[in-house]
Amino acid sequence: MIELHQVSKSFNVNGKTVEAVKNVSITVEKGEIFGVVGYSGAGKSTLVRCINLLERPDAGQVLIDGKNLSTLSSKELRVARRKIGMIFQGYNLLKTATVYDNIAKPLKLEGVPKDEIEIRVNKYLSIVGLEDKRNNYPSQLSGGQKQRVAIARALAHEPEILLSDEATSALDPETTEAILQLLLKINAELGITIFLITHELDVIQRICDRVAVMENGHLVEQGTVLDIFTKAKHATTKRFVGSEASFDIPQDLLEKYIATGKLVSLHFIGDEADEPALALVSRKFDVLPSILAGGIDHLKNGTLGKLLVHLKGDEAEYSKAIAYLKESGVVVEEVELL
């Protein structure tokens, strides 16, 4: 378990104090995939580096399985860090070392026996699907393959926690999807807790169980991925998930629709995404629904259907229709112009 209690971290930049992380508290359960999302400068990278004390917090506590890392001696901290692997956007591979040696060298420095190193390197190269690349050099690999080597290197220490600092942000969409599937596999098969930071909402929705949203060093909202997608409260979260969204429909067109009825965002969760609730509205009530835009998001634990709908009818019938949709399990939010 990862517990952050009122963690703060600041830096001195050109004589000025910059507060990168401000009183952040997060609890991540064992075996969970937890994501932190935010725009550039939100404090995400500083926060993730506080977990293994690559950045030592100015205030607050970082607890791993109940143990306060800040109180450990240098030797004890080195031992604790072996259970916390980390991958980065930039891979950080040794250019003059083979794939095998990039994974093996850190183990040698830890004093792992040669036979055990051979076993671990082969095991984790197999898990990341690079058995045939063990004698290649980084320059001979694609970006996705380099990231797989970095993941294998982190796993070779057999950690209980894997930290990911924007690990997919430099990859193309297809390679990103492959890396995300690999992280899901690692989580499911090895039981490793994953704490990742990203500015890509697709990453969050594809693999995370829960998510926190950061802005200007503050944690502004957190919850399950489904709750964040359907019940976003903070303005920053809403900008990310588009819960106030217009699906990129021009503002003047939105104004036209709102002037002639109600504009609502509908979210159909799980099995409800396949139910004809909206189709039944026009039969049961004196309202005319028009679908303006829509889509389906595939979350880690289910499906989320999204529709932007114009409802035309009198206020009483509109209220009945909305009540019916909510009773049918649909999350309804009236869209207002910003």
Swiss-Prot record:
Gene3D superfamilies: 3.30.70.260, P-loop containing nucleotide triphosphate hydrolases (3.40.50.300)
Protein origin, superkingdom: Bacteria
SMART domains reported in the protein's UniProt record: AAA, NIL
UniProt EC number: 7.4.2.11
Class of the enzyme per the UniProt entry, highest EC level: translocase
Membrane topology: Peripheral membrane protein
GO molecular function list: ABC-type D-methionine transporter activity; ATP binding; ATP hydrolysis activity
Any one GO CC term of the record: plasma membrane
Residues that bind ATP: G38, Y39, S40, G41, A42, G43, K44, S45
Pfam families associated with the record: ABC_tran, NIL
Keyword annotations of the record: Amino-acid transport, ATP-binding, Cell membrane, Membrane, Nucleotide-binding, Translocase, Transport
Keyword hit for Transport: yes
Signal peptide from the UniProt entry: none
Subcellular location: Cell membrane
Catalytic activity: L-methionine(out) + ATP + H2O = L-methionine(in) + ADP + phosphate + H(+); D-methionine(out) + ATP + H2O = D-methionine(in) + ADP + phosphate + H(+)
Recorded family membership: Belongs to the ABC transporter superfamily. Methionine importer (TC 3.A.1.24) family.
Quaternary organization: The complex is composed of two ATP-binding proteins (MetN), two transmembrane proteins (MetI) and a solute-binding protein (MetQ).
Name recorded for this polypeptide: Methionine import ATP-binding protein MetN 1
Organism of origin: Listeria innocua serovar 6a (strain ATCC BAA-680 / CLIP 11262)
